[in-house]
Amino acid sequence: MKLPQAFYARDTRTVARALLGKVLVHLDGGVRRAARIVETEAYHGPDDRASHARAGPTPRAAIMFGPPGRAYVYLIYGTSHCMNVVTGPEGFPSAVLIRAAEPIEGCLHSTRGPGNLCRALAIRREHDNGRDLGGDDLFVEDAPPPAEAVVTGPRVNVGYAGAWAARPWRFALRGSPWVSRPAPGAAAARAARAPAAPAPRPRRPRGSGP
């Protein structure tokens, strides 16, 4: 079942977490391409310095100011498309970036990372930007809540955003091999599980014998 518009018409951070485990589907020329979402990032409101909406409703970001449940697809580095879903109430610019997914069906490429994911599902700005996710070509299917724990951390590559870069608005399924970067908190978790290093053996004074 497709997610209804009401699913997206909530706080961006709530939607970013709730999308984990759901299935992104693109019907491309009659071919079904699908992947299970394992990593997202929330971009919340006009004050978020990491968001495209910080500059107002520019031609690129205008979709973020529109109704929830639309696809916001843009190009980075001139070659890679990124797929977002518009969230929250209309007029409050916010969206969730789908960073990575687990391939299920018809994927053409690795689905690890937002550019790879769009290539794998053949999602393109010129065809899919602004699409209503309640339609028949590009949508998100409901799925049971994931069994994996959800971990959070700072968003990727937004160092320019000052204090906003530290907001823990990246969400990922712990242990998924399809996450684009090590899952937030993974290094700390590994360190916590690692056995403590043995204490250094004290040196004996020279000539003290065995």
Curated annotation (Swiss-Prot):
Biased composition (Low complexity): 181-196
Gene Ontology MF terms: alkylbase DNA N-glycosylase activity; DNA binding
Residue ranges, annotated region (Disordered): 181-210
CDD domains tied to this protein: AAG
UniProt superkingdom: Bacteria
Enzyme class at the top of the EC tree: hydrolase
UniProt entry tagged with the keyword Thylakoid: no
Biological processes per GO annotation: base-excision repair
PANTHER family documented for this protein: DNA-3-METHYLADENINE GLYCOSYLASE
Entry similarity comment: Belongs to the DNA glycosylase MPG family.
Name of the protein in question: Putative 3-methyladenine DNA glycosylase
